[in-house]
């Protein structure tokens, strides 16, 4: 029986025209997509970088209240005080240089040394007292008088990247504040009431000047200086009481040397962050752009930890490394999230909101934890605002507590007894009773059982 062999049909042995057409279309679309991908990748990799300095006008407007005040400028006097501080170190202890703290002013008011756990020796105390005498001969108190009287504070605006703006004056101002604290302690022991109050106001003035600038660290240094001044005044208030006229002078000094609101520093941080976002992203015509890791690493020292690996985008040649920015939020998206956070912060510190209720309005730390990890610049550069706000609240509470302590002592000095309630201090001594910045409630007060007994302390 003959065997029949099946003949393959043309449609089974080769693609149909329709299949070939579909394959060509898919290939063409793939090549087109690849071309678009390459073109957009090249645009990201080769895009011109953003530039720093776009927000100089905003910085100037922010600081205008402190720069437009009438009278002399405090900032040149800060430079003069720093120069005298160098001369003071050289003359007070010429054999060891500026890094030796054996003649520190802390020896006059603290039981522990800065560099060890021993208390100050008599030699330490004598060196500190000698340094205070040398400072007076150099004219340092007179310079601090001019700083206290000056309402204007004009530190030069930042040029270039704000994040690289150096603040060397802050450390020197803290040194000068410790010098003032040493003067206060020495004057308390010797009964020089005018010198004690003058040194107190000098320290407050240094804090005010530092805090009248645009960064959070400026503000926190001002807070720390004020805390030191208030603590030193209160510590000696019972054992070394001030006469009524000097109690009034200390109250007036507090009113003359207030810290500016922390809202100014927070707005300065926002402008600084926007500046960093601007120059770490490319500059596209629609005011958008992509993060450029290589540029950021070169300018900010980002090559740490895993960034030291040769595989990390920050170590790639700039055009190639910039491709990593394609997978991160754009400049516009990053700016929007940064503004969202700072707007929430400003709402939370509005007048009338006590510290205990602040996080119910906006919790910066919780917000930052919930921010996606790919918002690199925001997550990396936003400071710990929770701690900063706590320091500000603490300084406000210490200021108002010191004001009340001075008022109570003034009432005692003029009436031979402490007040029965804080209400007796108004309006003869204080225009109004302060409110606790933390609780939002009035300060508590319990009069001593024996009005004739000395105050146990503040």
Where are these regions (language model features)?
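Short acidic linear motifs
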Residues: 2-458
């Amino acid at each position: 029986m003959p065997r029949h062999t099946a003949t393959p049909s043309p449609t089974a042995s080769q693609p149909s025209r329709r299949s070939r057409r579909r394959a060509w279309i898919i290939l063409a679309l793939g090549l087109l997509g690849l071309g678009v991908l390459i073109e957009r990748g090249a645009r990201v990799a080769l895009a011109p970088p953003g530039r720093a300095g776009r927000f100089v006008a905003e910085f100037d407007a922010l600081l205008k209240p402190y720069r437009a005040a009438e009278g002399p400028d405090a900032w040149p006097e800060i430079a003069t005080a720093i120069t005298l501080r160098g001369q003071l170190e050289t003359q007070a202890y010429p054999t060891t240089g500026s890094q030796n703290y054996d003649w520190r002013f802390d020896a006059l008011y603290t039981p522990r040394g800065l560099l060890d756990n021993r208390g100050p020796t008599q030699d330490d105390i004598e060196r500190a007292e000698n340094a205070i005498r040398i400072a007076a001969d150099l004219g340092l108190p007179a310079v601090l008088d001019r700083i206290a009287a000056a309402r204007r504070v004009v530190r030069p605006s930042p040029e270039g990247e704000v994040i690289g703006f150096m603040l060397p004056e802050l450390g020197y101002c803290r040194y000068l504040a410790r010098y003032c604290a040493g003067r206060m302690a020495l004057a308390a022991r010797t009964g020089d009431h005018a010198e004690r109050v003058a040194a107190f106001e000098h320290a407050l003035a240094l804090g005010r000047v530092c805090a009248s600038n645009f960064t959070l660290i400026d503000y926190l240094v001002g807070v720390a200086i004020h805390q030191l001044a208030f603590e030193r005044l209160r510590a000696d208030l019972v054992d070394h009481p001030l006469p009524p006229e000097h109690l009034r002078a200390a109250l007036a000094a507090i009113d003359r040397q207030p810290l500016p609101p922390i809202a100014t520093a927070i707005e300065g941080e926002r402008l600084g962050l926007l500046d960093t976002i601007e120059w770490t992203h490319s500059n596209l015509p629609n005011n958008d752009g992509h993060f450029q890791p290589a540029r950021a690493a070169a300018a900010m020292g980002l090559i740490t930890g895993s960034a030291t690996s040769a595989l990390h985008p920050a170590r790639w040649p700039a055009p190639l490394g910039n491709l990593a920015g394609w997978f991160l939020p754009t400049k516009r998206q990053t700016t929007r999230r940064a503004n969202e956070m700072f707007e929430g912060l400003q709402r939370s510190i509005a007048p009338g909101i006590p510290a205990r209720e602040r996080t119910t309005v906006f919790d910066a730390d919780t917000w930052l934890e919930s921010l996606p990890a790919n918002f690199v610049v925001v997550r990396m550069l936003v400071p710990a605002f929770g701690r900063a706000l706590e320091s500000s609240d603490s300084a406000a509470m210490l200021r108002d507590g010191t004001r009340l302590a001075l008022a109570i002592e003034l009432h005692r000095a003029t009436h031979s007894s402490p007040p029965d309630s804080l209400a007796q201090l108004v309006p003869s001594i204080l225009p109004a009773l302060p409110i606790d910045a933390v609780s939002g409630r009035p300060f508590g007060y319990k009069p001593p059982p024996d009005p004739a007994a000395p105050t146990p302390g503040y």
